[in-house]
């Protein structure tokens, strides 16, 4: 991508608000094929206004990172994408989250089917209390009826994609709890991709891991984007710079700046972003 292509422009909207200054907006339009388009998103924890008028296009087949200080709303934004908040009546989202033209906030689609399309891996590895094999097969069985031979192939495929197969192929019947922390997190990623989602959400996937395990997860993220749209929340700015194609900086529930990762880290538009990137704030 050349410098001309990385110039930050305002996110495409039907009309621009009065006084809108593209040079100061800090927001860029993602490539022409956004996988997810977020329009005027607001989110509330009861009366607390956690996300404020978020407009963002998440490009297909790329890695997008959400960065910002603790409490800025990046994990909240991530969890709106597959409606994790639906478990809590006091939480609500307003606006649009469009995926293939469908508003995920108002769709009548079964929530489990939505989460099959948009998988999620959490901060702490969460293997199920069952064998390594069954950890992978469990989700698949919810949506597909496969003969044993095909299930075996799916399990091997998912573990291979997660760079774990060679380490566990001789102990598939053993508990997932017996794996190291890094292996457990890769098991959770394998479990997520086994149902073949279109989007994979990663919420601080390396925060509890050692540097070697973190490096393996980062290599895996780079490989996964060839098949999935990946969105990652991270406090580690170096990780965002290494892993992502696009970066969104958030502060106090607002999207401050979004654009090509290299541009965000080398020449951000907004002073708030520069202060955070350089360590003068946050």
From Swiss-Prot:
PROSITE patterns: ABC_TRANSPORTER_1, ABC_TRANSPORTER_2, PSTB. It catalyses: phosphate(out) + ATP + H2O = ADP + 2 phosphate(in) + H(+). CDD domains: ABC_PstB_phosphate_transporter (cd03260). One of its GO terms (cellular component) is plasma membrane. It is a peripheral membrane protein. ATP binds at residues 68-75. Residues 36-277 form the ABC transporter domain. It is an enzyme of class 7 (translocase). Its main location: membrane. One of its GO terms (biological process) is phosphate ion transmembrane transport. Belongs to the ABC transporter superfamily. Phosphate importer (TC 3.A.1.7) family. The complex is composed of two ATP-binding proteins (PstB), two transmembrane proteins (PstC and PstA) and a solute-binding protein (PstS). This is Phosphate import ATP-binding protein PstB. It comes from Paraburkholderia xenovorans (strain LB400). The gene is pstB.
């Amino acid at each position: 991508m050349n410098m001309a292509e990385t110039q930050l422009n305002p996110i495409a909207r039907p009309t621009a608000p009065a006084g809108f200054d593209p040079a100061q907006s800090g927001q860029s339009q993602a490539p022409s094929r956004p996988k997810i388009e977020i329009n005027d998103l607001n989110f509330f924890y009861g009366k607390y206004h956690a996300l404020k008028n978020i407009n963002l296009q998440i490009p297909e087949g790329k890695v997008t990172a959400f960065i910002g200080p603790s409490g800025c709303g990046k994990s909240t934004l991530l969890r709106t994408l597959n409606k994790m908040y639906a478990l809590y009546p006091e939480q609500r989202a307003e606006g649009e989250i469009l995926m293939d033209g469908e508003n995920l906030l108002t769709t009548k689609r079964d929530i489990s089917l939505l989460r099959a399309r948009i998988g999620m891996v959490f901060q702490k590895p969460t293997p199920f209390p069952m064998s390594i094999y069954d950890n992978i097969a469990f989700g698949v069985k919810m949506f597909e009826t496969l003969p044993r031979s095909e299930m075996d192939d799916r399990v091997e495929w998912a573990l291979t994609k997660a760079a774990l197969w060679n380490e566990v192929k001789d102990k598939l019947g053993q508990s997932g709890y017996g794996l190291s922390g890094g292996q457990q997190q890769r098991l959770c990623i394998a479990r997520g991709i086994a149902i073949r989602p279109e989007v994979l959400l990663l919420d601080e996937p390396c925060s509890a891991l050692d540097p070697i395990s973190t490096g393996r997860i980062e290599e895996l993220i780079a490989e996964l984007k060839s098949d999935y749209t990946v969105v990652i929340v991270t406090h580690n700015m170096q990780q965002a710079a290494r892993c992502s194609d696009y970066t969104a900086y958030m502060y106090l529930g607002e999207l401050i700046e979004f654009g090509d990762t290299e541009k965000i880290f080398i020449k951000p538009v907004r002073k708030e972003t520069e202060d955070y990137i350089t360590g003068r704030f946050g």
